[in-house]
Amino acid sequence: MSLDSRMTPRVTINLSSIRSNYKLLESKLSNSVLASVLKANAYGLGIERVALTLSKAGCNIFFVATLDEGIELRQILPKATIYIFHGFFSESYGDYRKYKLKPILNSIDQIRDWLPYSDIMAGIQFDTGMLRL
């Protein structure tokens, strides 16, 4: 092994472990639903491979950061429920409707903006003090 090959970073993604971890978490739930967050290309692991693995494990609810990520995920998982963290913007209404994506409403203004378009379902973010958005 050359010095250069030892210094090259490498990531090994074990899809079997992702599936096992999902199934373990799911087994601990009662009267609850487990969802997966796949923003930023599944945190750099590869959205297609991770999404398909989780879907085969039984996951059908996903969260992504942006509308573009949601559209990409819709191509991979046509029947999944997909939420978009970055909220609702009326100029993107057509895409939310076409791709059956659900915005997470992050402010009173976004709720007001969404009301005329409320034929698409949305989620509401409640600030619990974690300051994650």
Regions found by a protein language model. Give the residues of each.
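Active-site-proximal beta-alpha core segment in soluble small-molecule metabolic enzymes
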Residues: S2-S5, P9-I13, S17-R19, S30-L133
